[in-house]
Amino acid sequence: MFTSTGSSGLYKAPLSKSLLLVPSALSLLLALLLPHCQKLFVYDLHAVKNDFQIWRLICGRIICLDLKDTFCSSLLIYNFRIFERRYGSRKFASFLLGSWVLSALFDFLLIEAMQYFFGITAASNLPSGFLAPVFALFVPFYCSIPRVQVAQILGPLSITNKTLIYILGLQLFTSGSYIWIVAISGLMSGLCYDSKMFQVHQVLCIPSWMAKFFSWTLEPIFSSSEPTSEARIGMGATLDIQRQQRMELLDRQLMFSQFAQGRRQRQQQGGMINWNRLFPPLRQRQNVNYQGGRQSEPAAPPLEVSEEQVARLMEMGFSRGDALEALRASNNDLNVATNFLLQH
């Protein structure tokens, strides 16, 4: 929607699809047909602490009672489906589970801190819904998704491929009085889980037997078919020319982004990716349709690509041709090729 992910829709993202459909349907059902049942899904930490209503930690943190929160969180989950394609459904579910559990602890700590330092007790009634894991996903989104400048406005300000996602997150952040507590808890839990602090990723994870069980039972229900008609960039006469145009377009975007930010291209070992080293063949390749009488340069022998890495990229939802092009351009670096494809 806002970020390009290689293929549209929810292909290879059954968990994201279930998180879009089930909570949204239940939220609409409670708002339109069963408003008298909404009290059962109120996220009331005061009732949890004083009345030992532990079940509210589950019911109050799954379904949104505010429809605009449902809409914003659904849009964010749709865009964050790229992590399910990258990590796989089991690791993605483990991240959501870990951040969901940790955020409940951080909610309690923040509420107690507000009551102790500021005497604010009304904050014990927090917004309901699956919101904290959505905010937690901003941590890997910020750290692992490359920033590509799309346009520049008002001098130093620029619009990137990530700008609209941050704006949508800000809209969700400001949608309620105390939702900032849930947002901070989600960001803290995402940071703890993503950085593997205290080995929480090994404790709060989905067991393999459970992942297999759900893959046999629920995954066929929420799985989506592979898109057959993708809109292609460029007007090349053949698929090879179209793929070449797509690669060259992304190369130009990356170069423009680095130029606008004032970065100088230099080779570093173990540091930032040197795009001039990875992508010069894309700019130097010339097709017979665009030569205009000039002689083409001698073609370099094709780089051998690992079939295992091609298979992993295809499991994320990318086509075989795009996976081969990205792996050749990135010198068989799977991480660079994945980030490359996620931006196109």
Curated annotation (Swiss-Prot):
Q: Name one GO cellular component term.
A: endoplasmic reticulum membrane
Where the protein is mainly located, per its record?
endoplasmic reticulum
**Disulfide linkage:** none
Tell me which SUPFAM superfamilies the record gives.
Rhomboid-like (SSF144091), UBA-like (SSF46934)
UBA domain segment(s): 304-344
Where do glycans attach? Answer: N161
A GO molecular function term, named singly, is: serine-type endopeptidase activity
- Residues in compartment: Cytoplasmic: 113-125, 185-344
Q: What job does this protein perform?
A: Restricts trafficking of FAF2 from the endoplasmic reticulum to lipid droplets. In association with LMBR1L and E3 ubiquitin-protein ligase AMFR, negatively regulates the canonical Wnt signaling pathway in the lymphocytes by promoting the ubiquitin-mediated degradation of CTNNB1 and Wnt receptors FZD6 and LRP6.
Protein name (database record): Ubiquitin-associated domain-containing protein 2
Query: What species was this sequence derived from?
Result: Homo sapiens (Human)
